Structure formats: C-alpha cells, structure tokens
Amino acid sequence: MKTVFAILFLTFIAFTYAKSYEDVKEEIKNEVEREIFEDLEEESDVLDSNVRELNDAKPWRFRRAIRSIRWRKVGPYVPIIVKMAGKK
C-alpha cells in the first residue's frame, strides 16, 4: 500500500509541475520503473540471505533431509511401499 500511495503522490506532483502530457507520462514511467527496481533489489537481498542460510553447514542433516520431503506427495504411496516390503 505504501508504494501505491507513493506512486499516486508522485503522480500528483508530476501533474502539478508538468508542462505537457508527455512530461507527465515520462515522469510516471520513470517513477514506476524506479519503484520496480527497488522492489526487485529488496527481493534479491531476501533471496540471497535465504541461500546463505541453506548453505550453512549444520548438524542433524538427516533430520533436515526428512523435513524437506514433501509428505503430501509421498504420503499416498506409503501403504503401497509397506505392502510390497512385507511380501518378500
């Protein structure tokens, strides 16, 4: 919501000080591009920090490996695997 209000405020300022429609259009385009680039930089910083956390050497690797399994996808196959293992 803050970015929306910032864009609207900057648009109002552009309309106030602009000399023509083209100036207003160019100003809005520049402000929107600037906001998009700032958001992308913030997201890339968050992604970089997540990558660093995942690459850290931590104990309990086996436990983390089990946690990372998507049980909703694997769950329906568990009874079949148990049945096959019991047959010999």
Swiss-Prot record:
Q: Membrane: present as a keyword of the record?
A: yes
- One CC-aspect GO term: extracellular region
Prosequence residues removed at maturation:
19-57
Q: Which domain of life is it from?
A: Eukaryota
Q: Does the keyword Cell cycle apply?
A: no
Q: Which UniProt keywords apply?
A: Amidation, Antibiotic, Antimicrobial, Immunity, Innate immunity, Membrane, Secreted, Signal, Target cell membrane, Target membrane
Query: Where does it localize?
Result: Secreted; Target cell membrane
Where does the signal peptide begin and end? Answer: 1-18
List every position bearing Alanine amide: 85
Q: What is its main location?
A: secreted
Q: In which tissues is it expressed?
A: Expressed in entodermal epithelium along the body column.
Please describe what this protein does. Answer: Antimicrobial peptide with a broad-spectrum antimicrobial activity. Keeps its antibacterial activity under a wide range of salt concentrations that mimic physiological conditions of human blood, which is surprising, since Hydra is an obligate freshwater animal with nearly no salt tolerance. Does not affect red blood cells.
- Family affiliation: Belongs to the arminin family.
**Protein name per UniProt:** Arminin 7965
Which species does this protein come from? Hydra vulgaris
